[in-house]
Amino acid sequence: MKKILKKEYLILKKWGQFLNCFKKFQKPCYFIVLGIIIILTSIGIFLYIQNTEIVPGDGGNFKEGILGQPRFINPVYLSNNDADRDLVELLFSGLMKYNEKGEIVNDLAENLEIKEDGKLYEIKLKENIFWHDGEKITSDDVVFTINVLQNPEYKSPQAIRWLGINIEKITDNIVQFRLKTAYSGFLESLTEKIVPKHIFEDISPKELPWYFSSREYIQKDLIGSGPFKFKKINQDNSTGYIKSITLEKNKNYFAKKPFLSEISFEFFSEENDLLKNLSRGNIDGYLISSSDGIENINEDKFNVFSLSLPRYFSVFFNQDPPEDKSDILTSKNVREALNYAVDKQQILKETISDKGKIINSPILPDFYGFNSPSEVYNFDKEKAEEILENEGFKYIDDTGIRKKSISQKSTFSFNKNLAYKDTNSDVTELQKCLADPKVGGPDVYPSGKVTGYFGNETKQAVILFQEKYKEDVLAPYGLEKGTGSVRTSTRKKLNELCFPNIEETVTLEFSLITIDKELFTNISEILKQNWKDIGVNVEIKFESISTLETDIIKPRNFEALLFGEVLSFLPDPFPFWHSSQKESPGLNLINYENKEADKLLEQARASLDNQKRQEKLEAFQEILIEDNPCIFLLRPDLIYFTSQKINGQQVEKIIEPSKRFTNVENWYIKTKRTWK
């Protein structure tokens, strides 16, 4: 015991000596201790940083600015309304979906089998997948959704995608789709969003669209299975204007759960107001479909994404215009000259600030990875002028517009000899001609009777006609008196006087119709100047999209049309160029017809082999460009601005604007550190 006490005493004594030292050398000791603490802390921090990593954390609210109002937030009545499509993309799921590379992958589907040479698709659903209200998703929901889309009483805009498709429930988690013929694009149809049967099965077709647009539906039955679910709506009670809709994370989502806690959609009626709120940081994201308005945004403050999608703008030349329209564009050489005269680089730079690509083909080789066409119409003003000169269109200095003279044969001419006692339609025309005061009149054919019979009166009139024009009719044969028979020289003079060839002056001009929106206005003005530079006069007409669709496109009532077309994930130009689609509701806008092109389009559509389909489409591309029925211009990018606080956005290609949310589950605002 004494030894222990002695030992403790010695320890206390040494500690006391240390304290005395610290008092004696207070400052030096303080800094030594502080240095040791700093070193140890730094080592700890270094080791922590070395052995941990920053990863996305849960939480954060993302605010998206939307121009316009939602109308039908449901896949059944999904239209071109961007607000509806954006919300549906986050609230609902399909059997298949697009990933960030634009590829089609499984969504609700666990497995997909394609059987019977592409005529049968069998899908097995994932286990334990649920609606936002907790009800399980089964094959019944899939069958119900497709039946609703196919039922004409519901009048769904999506119905055309499901014509001729038979769906059958095999088990609670297996369904089969049977096609009449193999169709490679059907895989894309399987991205259709599925709706819950238990919510909508008791609502009649007449009531359903009205219910979808009601506040009751949004607050009570806006049930999907997507990564986000409905939380609240902010709506003006007096006007019904929806100010915002907020979605919250679906914690029971069957796939990877989002990091963001909420996504709010803020709705604006004017783009200027939206852009102001974006610049002030009141909203975190806004999608601009063209370069319009970009100059008002400080790009340095945002993440700026140029999103590629398979849409393109072209000038379409009607190959079979209405009778009251000019047919000048049915000339392949004229179309070729117009093509060479277009400065596509100027259009790209001045209309969309180079945010897009120049295109030369209907199958967008740069987007889909196809081979480019062998022939490209690069800007060449001199070549365009040379083609028009060779076509007979001469430049008129006074007007700056090209014209050419065309000699058209008369619809009738005397081609056979006529003589006494003949009876036929040629005699009828002969009598009319002789009775014409400018040719003969009373001095030659006093009675002027038109009977179709070559009698004495007619014979005498022919004699007088021959003698009146004896220098041309009789003199070449050394005759002084008429013969009364209509032969070579007489026929020639009759044709010259009564049925001359018609000389027509054709002015190189046509009308171009397009949409009354700024981008199309700017493009059309450049086109007009490009064509004016080679002596072509163009009248530009602007129409609203509704008027354009109903009065212009549907009846094919135009000469030239500046418009856009959108392809899908699996490029299928069939609707736009196959001859079977020439009449509305087909989308062959210009009445294009080529049997070889038709065959290639049919083969490409039926092929499930990617390489073979590519070969068919590339062959079709060559034929179409050779026929030159349109001028391919550009493929604009979508410009997506997001706040720099948002991370994780990695979308490369999208099929439509709403697909910018494809990898939304990877977006994050907050971060945390975890051990490696």
Please name every model-derived segment.
Residues 42, 46, 313, 341-375, ...:
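Detector for C-terminal structural segments
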Residues 68-85, 108-109, 135, 157, ...:
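A structural "hinge/loop" feature
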Residues 64, 134, 278, 284, ...:
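Periplasmic binding protein-like
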Residues 166, 231-246, 264-325, 345, ...:
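Extracellular/periplasmic solute-recognition and catalytic clefts
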Residues 240-249, 329-445, 488-529, 593, ...:
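Append "and occasionally in soluble cytosolic enzymes with long acidic Gly/Pro-rich linkers
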